């Protein structure tokens, strides 16, 4: 067998098995219907989540297959994060706060994901891997140590409390699942940028059928689809950044060398609700709220950990790559829109006020039309359509895997653990697709408003998820310190921990409550907005307390946390891993380019 360059780390304590009510569950023994072919291809042990491809349905501890390559993982993280918000919705932030507020807000949000260093024996010392901290860095340290399905949800149960995992898991599941019908209807709206020929129900049916085809078969097909869609997103944002640089220097039909003109007139900052310093601060705060909900990435990377090839080598690099690329895209993207369009642009205001379809409300398209550039708006709209489709595809994957993780730990119905012979949790995927049928509400305009309510209702869930990640890491580190584990032997070690995690926790927690601040301003009280902004903040503790009272769970003491559960399986997989041969020259090129 080929060596991976990773030694099996030696830890100070043996495996702990817990049977008390509040303790972490002991992994079940895998049960495969066709036991004669339990071994996986290329030396994959079945215990590592690569069971047999025979038999129609199997049930066990974790029977997903490790078929996602490094290039898939990296583009999943980027593709799940870059959606229509970076191309279209970012214009609303420009109108609210101005170009400087928008740029500062997106930059500050990236400081909650600053880089820190990884170190894993000689191999990782030779390759300095960096990833965002505190949120992404905290997840990177835990996920690379134990790359399992639905990691941050299951880690919450192992390192904090089972009730905490239930609240976090269903919060994340509802958030991801409810965004699927939103993106499906977005695809229909984007198509209306051209013609209103295809009926809404037909577009919705086609998109849902495509999601089913991609997600109900082997995970490698999801990985391939997301790779190419995300690659298109990357090319689009890079192209738009280059476009901005060219036209600002006069490379446009009007030969207008405008540079940073709009930062001077009408200005770099825009007041919101009030004039003066208070108005400028509220404008910046509104941009900060938008950036907080827009920037993601590590959650999508971590959700693929249980299906990643060679995860202790691939995952640290994926976290590093996703951080730097998203940092560049979001910071330069927020800078670009402020260069192209003034914050008081009448066309941009009218586009959002009238709810114009597709890319019509994109600051880039508004700038193209002002500069009399004809073809590019259609290209942008086509790529925005791809972005919406890809985002919905990612939500189907993440929602189904989060539900699968809940089922694995006994927090969702047992039948949801079943996987097809290709390693797909079929009933979890079907459950998400059933929720996606809500997209047919788009057929009725009034019902479409109700659908938007659902989406707004779970918006705060994202920042709750980020807070959960940071707090879970804090408990994880306490357990490691209490049990004498040497963190330097982990596949990934972050800087400034646990202080970075506390910084991320406090920042995300505060932003969770700030999201609906506008309802508390004089004359701005609105009951629906209040409910949309704060309902999930109330639901989370209700679920947590309810499960805790019913199941009588307890917070895990640092000395009682099971830090070795399933680790031996991962280490055995790493020892026996043999890379699959490249299919062709194109496959070889992209695998090396994203390795």
Model-derived regions: residue spans:
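Membrane-helix boundary/coupling elements in multi-pass transport proteins
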Residues: 127, 148, 171-184, 290, ...
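Membrane-interface loop-to-helix entry segments
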Residues: 201-264, 296, 319-327, 455-468, ...
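TM-loop-TM module centered on a large, flexible mid-protein loop between adjacent transmembrane helices
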Residues: 151-157, 161, 271-275, 287, ...
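Helix-loop-helix connectors at the membrane interface of multi-pass transporters/channels
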Residues: 153-158, 183-204, 302-312, 317-324, ...
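Helix-loop-helix junctions that connect adjacent transmembrane segments
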Residues: 14, 31, 63-64, 195, ...
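Membrane-interface "cap" regions at the ends of multi-pass membrane proteins
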Residues: 1-103, 118, 125-134, 553-595
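Extracellular loop-to-transmembrane helix junctions
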Residues: 88-196, 200
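C-terminal membrane-solvent junction of multi-pass transporters and transport-like membrane proteins
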Residues: 418-423, 466-533, 557-563
């Amino acid at each position: 067998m080929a060596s991976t360059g990773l030694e099996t780390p030696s830890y100070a304590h043996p495996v702990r098995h817990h049977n008390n009510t509040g303790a972490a569950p002991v992994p079940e023994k895998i049960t495969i219907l066709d036991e004669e072919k339990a071994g996986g291809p290329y030396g994959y042990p079945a215990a590592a989540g690569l069971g047999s491809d025979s038999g129609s349905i199997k049930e066990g501890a974790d029977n997903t297959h490790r078929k996602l390559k490094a290039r898939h993982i990296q583009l999943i993280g980027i593709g799940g994060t870059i959606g229509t918000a970076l191309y279209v919705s970012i214009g609303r932030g420009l109108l609210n706060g101005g170009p400087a507020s928008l740029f500062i807000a997106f930059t500050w949000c990236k400081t909650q994901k600053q880089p820190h260093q990884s170190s894993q024996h000689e191999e990782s010392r030779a390759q300095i891997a960096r990833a965002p901290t505190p949120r992404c860095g905290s997840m990177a340290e835990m996920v690379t140590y134990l790359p399992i399905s639905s990691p941050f949800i299951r880690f919450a149960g192992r390192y904090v409390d089972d009730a905490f995992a239930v609240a976090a898991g269903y919060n994340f599941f509802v958030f991801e699942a409810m965004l699927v019908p939103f993106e499906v209807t977005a695809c229909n709206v984007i198509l209306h940028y051209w013609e209103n020929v295809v009926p809404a129900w037909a577009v919705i049916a086609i998109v849902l059928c495509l999601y089913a085809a991609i997600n109900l078969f082997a995970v490698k097909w999801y990985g391939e689809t997301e790779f190419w869609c995300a690659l298109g997103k990357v090319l689009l944002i890079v192209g738009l950044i280059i476009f901005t640089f060219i036209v600002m220097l006069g490379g446009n039909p009007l030969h207008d060398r405008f540079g940073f003109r709009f930062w001077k007139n009408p200005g770099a900052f825009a007041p919101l609700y009030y004039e003066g310093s208070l108005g400028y601060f509220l404008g910046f705060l509104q941009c900060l709220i938008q950036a907080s909900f827009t920037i993601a990435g590590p959650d999508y990377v971590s959700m693929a950990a249980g299906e990643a090839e060679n995860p202790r080598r691939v995952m640290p690099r994926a976290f590093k790559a996703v951080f730097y690329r998203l940092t560049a895209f979001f910071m330069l993207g927020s800078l670009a829109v402020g260069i192209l369009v003034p914050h008081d642009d009448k066309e941009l205001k009218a586009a959002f006020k009238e709810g114009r379809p597709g890319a019509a409300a994109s600051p880039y398209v508004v700038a193209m039309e002002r500069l009399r550039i004809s073809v590019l708006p259609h290209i942008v709209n086509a790529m925005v359509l791809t972005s919406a489709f890809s985002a919905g595809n990612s939500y189907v994957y993440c929602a189904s895997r989060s539900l699968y993780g809940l089922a694995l730990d006994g927090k969702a119905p047992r039948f949801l653990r079943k996987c097809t012979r290709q390693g797909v949790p079929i009933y979890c995927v079907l459950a998400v697709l059933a929720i996606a049928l809500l997209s047919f509400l788009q057929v009725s305009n009034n019902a479409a408003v109700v659908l938007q309510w659902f989406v707004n209702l779970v918006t705060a869930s994202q920042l709750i998820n980020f807070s959960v990640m940071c707090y879970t890491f804090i408990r994880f580190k306490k357990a490691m310190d209490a049990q004498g584990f040497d963190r330097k032997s982990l596949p990934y070690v972050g800087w400034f921990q646990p202080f970075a995690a506390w910084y991320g926790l406090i920042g995300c927690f505060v932003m969770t409550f700030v999201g609906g601040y506008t309802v508390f301003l004089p004359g701005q009280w609105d009951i629906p907005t209040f409910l949309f902004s704060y309902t999930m903040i109330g639901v989370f503790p209700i679920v947590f307390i309810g499960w805790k009272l019913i199941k009588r769970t307890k917070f895990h003491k640092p000395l009682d946390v099971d830090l070795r559960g399933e680790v031996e399986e991962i280490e055995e997989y790493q020892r026996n891993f043999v890379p699959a041969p490249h299919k062709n020259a194109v496959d070889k090129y992209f695998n090396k380019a994203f390795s």
